[in-house]
From Swiss-Prot:
Similarity section: Belongs to the ROX family. NO66 subfamily.
One GO biological process term: negative regulation of DNA-templated transcription
Positions annotated to bind Fe cation: H466, D468, H531
Cofactor binding comment, as recorded: Binds 1 Fe(2+) ion per subunit.
EC number: 1.14.11.-, 1.14.11.27
PROSITE patterns assigned to the protein according to its UniProt record, in alphabetical order: JMJC (PS51184)
Biased composition (Basic and acidic residues): 315-324
UniProt cross-references to SUPFAM superfamilies, sorted A to Z: Clavaminate synthase-like (SSF51197)
Cofactor: Fe(2+)
UniProt protein name: Bifunctional lysine-specific demethylase and histidyl-hydroxylase NO66
Gene Ontology molecular functions: 2-oxoglutarate-dependent dioxygenase activity; histone H3K36 demethylase activity; histone H3K36me/H3K36me2 demethylase activity; histone H3K4me/H3K4me2/H3K4me3 demethylase activity; iron ion binding
Amino acid sequence: MDPETLDDLVNELFDKKKQLTVSQKQQREKLQAYMMAQLEGSSSASDDDDEDDGEGEDDNDSNSDEDESGSESDATSADDSFSSDDNDDDDSGDEDGSDSGGSDSDLSFEDDSDYEDSHSTEDLTEYTINSENSSVEPTPPKRLKAGDKRPCSTQEEEESEDDNNNKPTARKLQMGESATNGRIQQRKSMVEPATTSKPASCPLTRKSLPANGSAAKSCPLPPKNQKQSAAAKSCPLPPKEKKLSSGAVAKSCPLPPKNEKPSSSGASCPLPSKTSKQVQPRVCQLSDKPKSSSSQSTQKRSKNEAAEGATDTNGRQEAHRQNSIEEGRRILSWVLNPIKPDDFFKDFWEKNACQVQRNAPTYFSELISFEMIDQMMLKHHLEFTTNIDVTSYKDGRRETLNPEGRAMPPTVWGFYGEGCSIRILNPSTYLPGLRTMCSLMQEFFHCLVGANVYLTPPNSQGFAPHFDDIEAFVLQVEGRKRWRLYMPLQPSDVLARESSGNYTPDQLGEPIFDEVLKPGDVLYFPRGTVHQAITEKKHHSLHITLSVYQQQAYANLLEKLMPMVLQSAIKHSVSLRRGLPLHTWQHLGIAHGATKCSSRSQLIKGIQEMVQQHLTPSENQIDAAVDQLAKRYQHEALPPTILPEEKLRTVFGSRSATDAHGKCLCDYELTEDTSIRLLRANILRLVVDETHLRVYYYVDNALEYCKYEANFMEIEPTEAAAVETLMHAYPAYVKISMLPLRKPERRIEVATALWERGLLMTETPFK
């Protein structure tokens, strides 16, 4: 058979009208070469063999039939396989176009170890989209056709005044597919950094399904450090009558005037600061490492100085000698700078609102940012309602729009792009810098310092006017937000113990404060102050609200105290146990309130005298009630952030090993000459619970609020004096031999037990 006949035979195996792909053409060429080899073999065999021609023809016919059928099956399978490959290529192209660089079931992170630390293998199995344990089939992401409209996909839409369109400027896309593909363009606007000096911080590699099962639009990140035209007045609120000078404290009613001006150098930052052209200090790093002239010298001396406890260039004591209460005060000073804490508590605390204005846009930028929120949602399992709220306030109506399930960036940013506010309820759980700040401040305030983060798109409001039951410190991180404060509507709302419901605009009077917060500014207002906030037309807002002194009033103390007093009085006073007079019902009660008679007057006077006589608390009862409030603090507090110098002196830096026989070898040993002190001033509390003497402590608390029961250890009454000695000596070190216990062995045992629980620190490292 000549090549032309063979070619005709090959063409018969394929549809002539079908347009062949490159892979099919290659397959046809392979088949053609195979048939040529078969023909050459059969022709040579016919020349050499002397067998019957008829048999040869029959054999050739059968072989030809077999080859033909085999070729058809090969061609069919090849066609299926290559068409499948083509489909896979198309799918992968769509994934790339819709911001995916991997398979649907894969997530990549910049640091896998960080993710492994926060998730167990079971967590990964549970939350993987394609998990075998999942009983719900994931809904495939909605694909838009080429002609469908996507946000910010055309030049005409980009130039239109969309208040919620905050795609960062100066981010140029490369020419090619990414320049025309709307899905790639949207993802690049989310992933690429705002400046070219830093690498991309978002490790997104695929488009995740929205938590509520519907396709949520992705929203580009808002611009950072966006410049505003001086002539533009985009705020939808009524114009202000006055301007506040930069660096001054607001003097709007009812704030008392302050003549104090910030110094030219500004207050020193409580955290080591980098060189900056700004006059005011900025947050750079939430740690207490000493400053160094170069990074090389810092690396060489870091371990030695951590062990020796070197003093930093600011003249502060080394970390292991610092008083945690004073450190918390120092952080508050930095937040309120240039107002001093003493002046703040004298003039503003629980009295008036206070605004601090700064020309320092990066003052709080190290605490949180848009990119940090994006990474936080990727690296940790945050749930709607539990960790994140989606809220809106439009036309006087407040709504919470939380879907169910995990909060992933595409879903959250989709809500944000639609004008919703995002509230993060416990960011300090996931952000070490913010957690360190709160853990230091809680030592000063002697109560939990909570933090919420609020992210609001331009020209939006997420919450209705209301008041809270906390002292609020608003730290403006990014963008601008206009705040209006109102006097409490009722006298009982002053220093309110519970938060209010939502107010309508017609219930409010004229605001006593109406100002715009800019990055670096701070606003304080007492609990019970009615407030509302709205972003300007062309500015988003990112701020932190620090909440302190929740349920920390005299009323809370009396709620603990008076039941104790009453129970003790009943136990020790027989007069309180006597029965009521028989005629009590006929003279007392609401129906007899207007009655004037001697019997009624005598009954009322006797009860009042009985209360004055028997229900006056003793010192011991007041102490016990305060201990109960302190016990609540031990349960609610954030765990302490252990600094390098402290780690070398605590159980957190201890490493155990085994010898050749498997015996455990510890690298520490406390003796009578070992000097010890408490890790923090309020790290523990000695409390009497009924008949038990317990030491409550918060060093082992979870990062989530009250996730576990309160931690405590029971001690003998004879050992309480040793704990009291450590509490009174703080922040000084005392030798174990100074503990008021009879036997040296017992002193060492008590000290070792406290040290092994992370409550004590030694003056000298064991290593």
